[in-house]
């Protein structure tokens, strides 16, 4: 049976999803509250992981070890790295990599974590398809599929943005996705990252982010609800085959 883990970083990203859940039982582990219940007919576990890569990875491991999730979705907001991506647009991850991991001194490619067999951690094709369909249902014509670039930094500087684009060729930047992707990858749990654009990751970001944070986060939560429904339909169809 499919059991979907949904991870958000902040209150604004998870409050809408929690309000849509039924049969909710909440458990606190390692400082985070895990809400187990049903979303759009699908068993889910929803957690607010907090900001940053360590918090995100910790919650993924708990979801895998303590709740037995079979699939993972990271929902939230991000800064645009692409001129064609405007505030309110949506990004579905093809893969995710770190923009602040650099072992090039030792001969590794930029972003490569020693011991890993990939630089960018690939999303699951089925989840990607479900996420894209859900995003297009909410905001037709405003969804891009591509790379999510992650680091422990809120990007509000055009020079930093330009460097991240050069190093990663990412579509958007945020602070949790690649850590979630790496932890899911190491646990062989399929994942996808879903991001709504809240700012342009440049010198306008400090002004745009507070204004559009809630709008972007609620849009992403709406897509996550539809994604759960798509996953339920997909697993039901697979069971019938």
PLM segments and residue spans:
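N-terminal short beta-loop-beta anion/metal-coordinating cradle
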Residues: 2-67
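Alpha-helix C-terminal capping segments
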Residues: 62-66, 84-85, 182-190
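Mid-sequence, gly/pro-rich, charge-dense loop/helix-turn segments that line enzyme active sites
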Residues: 81-168
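A C-terminal functional module that forms or caps the active site or interfaces directly
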Residues: 155-193, 198
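Regulatory input/activation interfaces that engage signals or partners
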Residues: 191, 196-233
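Conserved small/polar residues in nucleotide/adenosyl-binding loops
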Residues: 234-239
